[in-house]
Amino acid sequence: MQAEFKLRSKILLQPLVLLHIIDAYERRPKDCTQVIGTLLGRNNPESGHLEISNCFTLLHKDYPNSDRIDVDLQYANDMYELNQLTYPQEKIIGWYATGKEVSRSAVNLHEYYARECADGNPMHLLIDTSLRGQRMMMRLYTAVVMGVPNGTKGLMFSLLPVEMSSGNPESVALNLMKKNALQPTKQVGRILPELVQVVDITRDLQTKLDLVLRYVNETLARKRTPNNTVGRALHDALTSVPLVDAESFRMMFNANVRDMLMSITLATMIKAQLKISESVIAMPDL
């Protein structure tokens, strides 16, 4: 029954999950041909859809030409318990793997995650990192029991509908990454300071506000035909913003800037500490 529900429902995938999988694949050991990990998610009560919102990588060992796979279960349990301390609403909903097709070890992994999932029917996210056709293909499966009654039975992995979903913070980050990728003359990997990004976003917001004011003035002057859809959208946008005076807005803006500067300082300190730690670890033994 759960499998039938998933086959008909829409699954939403957060960009953070893909970025985590790509990072894990780039950092994999040299003797590993793929990476696998646990998918975490939650049910969205507003939309009624299931969201894949997080994941973590598993330590494992593959055996070529065999369906055997060894997984560090203690590490998996520890990672899940640590994640529950911060995000208790995220539960295990399946696993992910990199590759062009479903591996021979998928059945064994399905049996393990069937015990870990609340509904007993985990999902399998397959990411093709070979970039065939300059695209990273992703497919989501659910296992359906097939076979003859009172006879031999097996599993068939059926495709599930999956869509990318992102909120406002994720959209800002994705737009920035896309903007940097479309500028080949820019230094690769270089990200502008946060304050410069705030200035750019503020400038874009001012441009959009000027466009809205021009539309409203032209409509009031009867130079443009009124559009009820646009009017309702503007009304919803304006009523969603609380009405505050200039002094209160200035104080809130300054407080947010101070918080951002503190975050930048802490992030810089952590980055410097990580670089020092990597340098110390890479030093040869004396």
Curated annotation (Swiss-Prot):
It is found in: Cytoplasm. Coiled coil: none annotated. InterPro entries: eIF3f, EIF3F/CSN6-like_C, JAMM/MPN+_dom, MPN. GO terms for molecular function: metallopeptidase activity; translation initiation factor activity; translation initiation factor binding. Residues 11-147 form the MPN domain. One of its GO terms (cellular component) is eukaryotic 48S preinitiation complex. PROSITE patterns: MPN. Disulfide bonds: none annotated. Keywords: Cytoplasm, Initiation factor, Protein biosynthesis. Gene3D superfamilies: Cytidine Deaminase, domain 2. It comes from the Eukaryota. GO terms for biological process: formation of cytoplasmic translation initiation complex. It holds the Pfam family JAB. SMART domains: JAB_MPN (SM00232). Component of the eukaryotic translation initiation factor 3 (eIF-3) complex, which is involved in protein synthesis of a specialized repertoire of mRNAs and, together with other initiation factors, stimulates binding of mRNA and methionyl-tRNAi to the 40S ribosome. The eIF-3 complex specifically targets and initiates translation of a subset of mRNAs involved in cell proliferation. Belongs to the eIF-3 subunit F family. PANTHER family: EUKARYOTIC TRANSLATION INITIATION FACTOR 3 SUBUNIT F, EUKARYOTIC TRANSLATION INITIATION FACTOR 3 SUBUNIT F-RELATED. Component of the eukaryotic translation initiation factor 3 (eIF-3) complex. The eIF-3 complex interacts with pix. This is Eukaryotic translation initiation factor 3 subunit F-2. It comes from Drosophila willistoni.
